[in-house]
Design a protein with these regions (language model features):
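Phosphate-group recognition and catalysis centered on beta-loop-alpha active-site segments
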Residues: 1-300
Length: 300
């Protein structure tokens, strides 16, 4: 957030935060974990930050009441919010649902079955909402996503996120361990793999497309502009591209490249981009034509 922002950011993954995101931008991403009693819980981290043994801090080893007592909302709490679901059903909004695999302390080693159970529960929960097609995406970093889809038989659009990162530990360690996976997979290779698996979208880190890291992959690099962008268009064809993070200074460039942004920057007090242009937060659900863009950018 800008240092002078007066906006109070809601708790990540809370119903309040997701309602705000649904109203302010084109949709939201949320994280789900599975409790011991089979409830889908809106929580990101592999362990709760408490001074307790790991097996007492792991969400997958707790029941939903124990997790809720820590201030965590259930997925059902979100679906009970008409403010959220009405926008999902009628305002061209999308919801990306990231399914989390458990910390090793849980001793849940069959990630494909664990994810398949979550997928089935998600699809069953959404059955009566009558959502528009392609308004929901399920995904995760686990390489078992495709196997889980096969096991569950769900029909929701799905994909695997890249690079594959270990599901536990500190962020820096995760990135370090994930480096070989990042280096060995080019954008072209990722697109071919996802297409082969019947996945409509490639979800990837920005480093694949921007910065010096894009040069360390095998083959010719792609980028957000110039010849690299033309190369990206050629290899992606009609595949959707979901990319994170989305820095403010790159928002317009990424949108012009046809990329779906996954951004944490949903502060309603941010009205302009670093280049001085107006920031329009709903380019997909309420797109502006060129006349409106010019009018907004020329306004005082």
């Amino acid at each position: 957030m800008p240092p002078d922002s007066t906006w109070v950011r809601p708790t990540e993954n809370s119903v309040e935060a997701l309602e705000h995101g649904m109203k302010f931008v084109d949709g939201v991403e949320l994280d789900l974990r599975l409790s011991t009693d089979g409830e889908l819980m809106l929580w990101h981290d592999d362990l709760f930050e408490e001074k307790l043994p790991k097996n007492q801090r792991c969400p997958e080893l707790m029941n939903s009441e124990e997790i809720a007592a820590k201030g965590v909302n259930r997925f059902d709490d979100l679906l009970a919010s008409s403010e959220f679901t009405e926008l999902w059903k009628s305002s061209s909004k999308t919801v990306n649902i990231e399914l989390k695999v458990p910390h090793p302390v849980s001793r849940i080693s069959d990630h494909a079955s664990h994810l398949a159970s979550m997928m089935t529960k998600v699809e069953d929960s959404l059955e009566n909402l009558e959502l528009p097609k392609r308004s929901t995406m399920i995904y995760g970093f686990s390489p078992q996503i495709a196997e889980a889809v096969k096991k569950s038989g769900v029909t929701l659009p799905n994909t695997q996120l890249s690079p594959h990162l270990r599901s536990w530990g500190k962020s820096k360690i995760k990135r370090l361990i994930g480096s070989p996976n990042f280096v060995s997979n080019s954008v072209s290779g990722l697109i071919k793999d996802r297409r082969r698996k019947g996945m409509p979208v490639v979800g990837m880190a920005l480093h694949y497309l921007h910065g010096w890291e894009r040069f360390i992959h095998p083959g010719a690099p792609v980028s957000l502009t110039g010849k690299g962008l033309n190369r990206l268009f050629r290899v992606s064809q009609e595949m959707g591209l979901h990319v994170w993070p989305a820095p403010l200074k790159l928002e317009a460039i990424m949108l012009d490249a046809g990329i779906t942004l996954i951004s944490d920057l949903i502060d309603p007090t941010i009205h302009s981009l670093p280049n001085g242009d107006v920031r329009w937060p709903r380019p997909a659900s309420q797109p502006l034509d060129e006349e409106w863009k010019k009018a907004l950018n020329s306004a005082d």
